[in-house]
């Protein structure tokens, strides 16, 4: 994608819009994690259970200083994209959703990393209504969401062998719970 596309994505997000874009794994619907109205728009468009949290994508571990080492370690050592669940610290209610933890993932996708470096962390649930399978291409995403999404960014077809990220929680004793 061109610099113009990057600018279009960041402008859309900064103005409260939501964007369907390929992540490290599958297509996601992204919105600024700091924008409550945009986050709620994603929930409405996906018809997502309001009590379910979304993974927060970050460009680097310094975005979460209290847990930077843990997030960095698992992002670098796991072979597949891995979201790490850590205790919530000062995240807003529209992110924690009544819970006491948050899942963060350092993105590997270069375009998405550039976007996040410019606008800050984004939520990124899969690009599908709650009861449907994730979109594997932009045409499927458009069928699901139509004009309710502000911008679609075509990242090609997602191979059937690619699935959503692994989600882990590191327990106080150092053992790992594989949540997905």
Functional labels for PLM-detected ranges:
Residues 1-180:
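Active-site-adjacent structural elements in enzyme catalytic cores
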